[in-house]
Amino acid sequence: ATQFLIDETIQSLSVWWDKNSSGFQSKYSIEGEIVGFIVVKDFWNLSHLFVLPNYQRFGIGKALVQSAIDACKERSPEKKLKLNSSTYAADFYKCVGFRQSGPSLERPGGCIPYEYSY
């Protein structure tokens, strides 16, 4: 079921990407299976980061974030990468160098603004 969700998300993002190519996307595969992906819109808005639960805590998310930072560093109009994190992922983003950039918003699962400055 989770792989189906990943496949459907990647397919819908691919359609979006074909029409809006100002950004970055990358997939992380192991033995031909996509186990994670990242999407950054307009070279500054990290909109999607996902790693399958069985592959979390092996550095895949960190590698995907670093690839996005490297790709967007020179093209980001704000020289920053921004995102809104759930409370679940907040510690991860702090560990990879993001700083909270505003107050948390009351949303299901949390909504904490973060940014990474280049």
Model regions: which residues?
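Conserved GNAT-fold acetyl-CoA-binding loop/helix
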Residues: 1-14
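Conserved beta-hairpin
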Residues: 22-36, 41
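C-terminal "cap" of GNAT-fold acetyltransferases
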Residues: 77-91, 96-118
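Residue-level signal for alpha-helix termini/capping positions
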Residues: 18, 73-77
